[in-house]
Design a protein with these regions (language model features):
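Bacterial N-terminal signal peptides
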Residues: 5-17
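Proteolytic maturation boundary segments
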Residues: 18-45, 226-268, 275, 310, ...
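M16 family metallopeptidases and their MPP-like homologs
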Residues: 45-47, 52-78, 92-137, 166-194, ...
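Active-site His/Glu-centered metal-binding helix of metallohydrolases
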Residues: 75-83, 296, 547-548, 761
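A common structural junction motif
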Residues: 135-144, 237-245, 356-366, 604-611, ...
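Short, conserved secondary-structure transition motifs
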Residues: 155-161, 253-267, 376-385, 590, ...
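Conserved, carboxylate-rich catalytic/transport cores that coordinate ions
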Residues: 208, 576, 675
Length: 939
């Protein structure tokens, strides 16, 4: 199953509860929907849910990257971008105005088999979205200026996601190209720079006329709506779209079975650690073997009790990370296993270990415990997907397009419940033989032996690709004259959201217990939160809080790390521990029938961590490998350097994850001190969100945490020094595929009275697709795939940063645009209409977050570590909406002034250093190889 399919796997069957369950197992009801087909062939699905104030509108077209024309790889994906431009009645980017500017959002994606367009908006805007989707299906306008600009944006997306990202070429280029010899799945969906440049406007018009038609699409509406009114709107907007009198081209070629193993070795720049990827052909998603393969994948790679994690990462430590996914499609797909090799290990060791675990599936039966755990994990994934209207729509649409049956996911889940150990071994033997493998070894270019070269991994000459045959007499659509343009309908009366209400109590030992009831789905998120975090790390020990948090789930006085993972995952649940700048948390999500045994595990890891020396060394090695990977990513490294530039020697300046040097310096005593200072009942809060009552939550808290006693005083809040003087820093990363750009400056605490005006100012600057930065950098100039800004308001003063990635030569231009947009916000008042849309972005994002148990827990957890009262949950929307233009300008003038900002660029200095120095004579150039993030000077 593909990554998206794995996330959307859904059904109605209750799977057997794990041993020790306290209540009857939960059941998952099937998605209730209506279906009809219009005369023009458009299939319409409606899923009504009156518990939400939102609605999701989705149009999925049965055309994807496999349908890219000859010499036009990446075409379906580029066309996806163009669908957000003009139509006969909509101006460019008006879909964003209709969604983001009212508190919703929109997006789209291109898969090998389909292209989907999806929006979530307040339900009173449903009619407007139906109007817009029908208009771009029927009357897309393609003109030279927007076509050229969006083509440049797609090129930047390719550079950002593939060329500049460590391992980007492994997953996006080499994997598909080696996996297929005949089927057009071989071509990367992102395309190539040459093919993108060769595309023409006539190609675009022909593609739209060929595939973007009602009989090649489905419409899914999910959320709060009146069914009769919905039908009238659909009949009014979509039914008049004509069905073309010509067949739809289909890819019918079949990929032959692989009977001889293939392997390639490649060397790439900016590769922090070697990697290996092995793929095996599997049948189409609709095949009867897919449920057994889904269980196999879960046993192999889901959670820390999985075989790959236990063998490669935990026990033998040959991999920094290891995973597998089931990439099923309409036609032949793949099961893919991969590993990022640990520091000091070889790619050969990683490959041997991966293939050893695959072989075990063929030769040894899986255990009953592994089988039950995998099924429970799949069920929990299904429940979590149903938390939102959008998630339910994705399930239905994916099943319809990929499998040809809207009930396919439900049927597959029922079949998962019937999978046996013999089934798992059978499909492993059938599909995962040694001779059926395709292996890619991906190594740093520095490790290439003298005189050798990378193996070629081209698209095979035998791959069959069709020419794009333009239909005759394609109409050229032009924008309607202003006076004749049909305007979107007005929104209806808004539907009020029901805000969750936290209920608080406190145990005798001081532990605060907060419950938020949500009984619509049988799921609970429990989060134990405490103040502390990376800001409390001692000098020279950056990463201590993060390492301590990671170790909480790696062993207690009575359970080993493996036993903890198996215990929680056997319940179908997950457990994660981590830290932020200001706090730490342990989070459990589980079906509500398993909350009692899950709470016992949560309490054990919080109260009785062992911090065994061997676990510390294992976690240390994994953390060092992880930061080494991060240091090879231009965008990530730019943010780390910016933190040092802004805060200097203050605690917020040090990397929260640590550096290789600081992580090596951390001792067991440091870990124990960090734990004692952070985790005390009086300074911690237990959040319980979901299908549980306050009475039941308190009883569980008393049972499992009532005996918890502090073993040391709570840590004091760190003293944060004044921000450092602004700097302009260029980190030279030779051969970087893109430049990462960050402009950052100090911000305020979360409790500061200026928080809401600054939040609106930040969102105006860089929050969302319609923000000023994205308008100037992406939409108008095509210099980046996207530009954004963020406000991190913390307990001791935070940071505001504007950031993007761009091709190396344009980095100085992008810096200039960011600086100018920051300046303008403080020198002239923003129009009230613009601010209204930016407020809607904040309010809409908040509303979507509180639709899920994890989202509510995250918001409340942030409030707790930032000393914000939980009543903020109820006042957030009003506080945002009450901000006026004068307050925004005042906040921007004081807190966005670029004169107090540091500028950081990470990229290939040869291509832009001189231009940047002309603008900033005090430019500091630091080679990436000698960058020292442990030092405030960076040297």
């Amino acid at each position: 199953m593909s990554p998206i399919r794995a996330a959307l796997f859904l059904g109605a069957t209750a799977l057997p509860a794990a041993t020790g369950a306290q209540t009857a197992p939960v059941t998952v009801k099937p998605i209730v929907y209506t279906q009809r087909t219009l005369a023009n062939g458009l299939r319409v699905f409606a899923i009504r849910d009156t518990s939400t104030p939102n609605v999701s509108v989705q149009v999925w077209y049965d055309v994807g990257s496999k349908d890219d024309p000859k010499n036009r790889s990446g075409f379906a994906h580029m066309f996806e971008h163009l669908m957000f431009k003009a139509t006969r009645n909509l101006v460019p980017e008006q879909v964003d105005r209709l969604t983001e500017d009212v508190g919703g959002y929109n997006n789209a994606s291109t898969n090998d088999d389909y292209t989907n367009y999806f929006e979530v908006v307040p339900a009173n805007h449903l009619q407007r979205l139906l109007f817009a989707e029908a208009d771009r299906m029927a009357s897309l306008v393609v003109e030279p200026v927007s076509f050229a600009s969006e083509r440049d944006v797609v090129k930047e997306e390719l550079r950002q996601r593939v060329l500049a990202s460590p391992y980007g070429k492994l997953y996006s280029i080499y994997y598909p190209q080696l996996s297929y010899g005949v089927h057009p799945y071989a071509r990367p969906g992102i395309g190539s720079l040459n093919d993108l440049q060769a595309a023409s406007i006539d190609d675009v018009r022909a593609f739209h006329a060929t595939y973007y038609r009602p009989d090649n699409a489905i419409l899914v509406v999910s959320g709060n709506f009146n069914p009769m009114q919905l039908d009238r709107w659909i009949d009014g907007y979509f039914a008049p779209i004509a069905k073309p009198n010509r067949p739809i081209p289909r890819v019918t070629v079949a990929e032959p079975a692989r009977t001889q193993a293939v392997a390639r070795t490649v060397y790439e720049p900016n590769t922090p650690l070697p990697a290996v990827l092995v793929s095996y052909h599997v049948p189409p998603d609709r095949d009867a073997d897919t449920p057994a393969l889904t269980v196999l994948q879960a046993i192999l790679a889901t959670g820390e009790s999985s075989r790959l994690y236990q063998s490669l990462v935990y026990r033998d430590q040959v991999a920094q990370s290891a995973a597998a996914f089931l990439d099923t499609k309409q036609s032949t797909g793949n099961l893919v296993a991969y590993a990022i090799v640990a520091g000091g290990k070889t790619v050969q060791q990683g490959e041997t270990a991966l293939k050893r675990e695959i072989a075990r599936l063929r030769t040894e039966p899986v255990t009953a415990a592994e089988l039950a755990e995998a099924k429970n994990e799949i069920l929990t994934q299904a429940i979590r997907q149903r938390e939102t209207a959008e998630g339910k729509a994705f399930v239905l649409a994916t099943s319809t397009i990929v499998d040809g049956d809207p009930d396919a996911s439900q049927k597959q889940l029922e079949a998962v419940g019937r999978v046996t150990a013999a089934d798992v071994r059978r499909v492993a033997a059938k599909y995962l033989g040694d001779r059926q493998s395709a292996t890619i070894r991906y190594l740093p270019v520095e490790s290439r032996p003298a005189g050798s070269a990378s193996d070629a991994v081209p698209i095979a000459a035998t791959v069959r690709v069709a020419d794009l045959r333009a239909p005759a007499d394609i109409p050229v659509v032009t924008p309607a004259p202003v006076g004749r343009r049909v305007m979107p309908p007005q929104p209806a009366a808004p539907i009020a959201a029901v805000l969750p209400q936290p209920v608080e109590t406190r145990l005798v030992n001081g532990l605060r217990v907060v419950t938020v009831e949500r009984h619509d789905l049988p799921i609970v998120t429990a989060s134990l939160v405490a103040s502390g975090g990376a800001a409390t790390d001692p000098a020279g020990r950056a990463g201590a809080s993060g390492l301590t948090s990671a170790l909480l789930t790696k062993g207690t006085a009575t359970r080993s790390a493996t036993e903890i993972a198996r215990a929680i995952e056997s319940l179908g649940g997950s457990i994660e521990s981590g830290s932020s700048r200001d706090g730490a948390s342990i989070d459990v999500t589980v079906k509500s029938d398993q909350i009692a045994p899950a709470m016992a595990i949560l309490a054990d890891v919080a109260v009785h961590p062992a911090f065994k020396p061997d676990e510390i060394e294992r976690a240390r090695a994994q953390s060092i490998d992880a930061v080494n990977v991060e240091f090879k990513d231009p965008a990530q490294l730019a943010r780390l350097v910016a933190a040092r530039a802004v805060f200097g020697s203050a605690p917020y300046g040090a990397p929260a994850e640590g550096t290789p040097e600081s992580l090596k310096a951390i001792t067991r005593d440091d870990v124990q001190r960090s734990y004692r200072a952070t985790w005390t009942p009086a300074s911690a809060t237990l959040l319980m969100v979901g299908d549980i009552t306050p009475t039941a939550a308190r009883a569980l808290a008393e049972r499992h945490f009532g005996g918890w006693r502090a073993i040391g005083p709570a840590g004091a809040a760190p003293v944060v020094a004044a921000a450092a003087e602004p700097r302009v820093v260029l980190v030279d990363m030779p051969d970087a595929g893109q430049a990462g750009v960050v402009v950052a400056r100090p911000a305020i605490t979360r409790t500061d009275a200026r928080f809401y005006p600054l939040a609106v100012a930040n969102t105006t600057l860089g929050g969302g697709f319609s923000s000023r930065l994205n308008q100037e950098i992406r939409i108008k100039r095509g210099l980046s795939y996207g530009a954004a800004s963020s406000l991190s308001a913390r307990r001791q003063g935070g940071v505001i940063e504007a950031r993007t990635q761009t091709k190396n030569p344009t980095a100085p231009d992008v810096v200039a645009i960011i600086v100018e947009e920051m300046r303008k916000l403080g020198t002239a008042p923003a129009p009230a209409a613009e601010l209204d849309t930016r407020k809607a972005v904040l309010v809409g994002g908040f509303g979507r977050a509180i639709e899920t148990t994890a989202g509510i827990a995250d918001i409340l957890g942030d409030y707790l570590v930032q000393s914000v009262p939980l009543s903020e949950l109820s006042r957030y929307t009003g506080a945002v909406q009450g901000v006026d233009p004068r307050a925004v300008q005042a906040a921007a003038a004081e807190l966005l002034d670029p004169a107090r900002a540091s500028i950081v660029v990470v990229g290939d200095a040869r291509q832009f250093a001189d231009a940047l120095r002309r603008r900033y004579p005090k430019l500091e150039v630091i080679p990436a190889s000698s960058l020292n993030l442990d030092s405030p000077t960076l040297k």
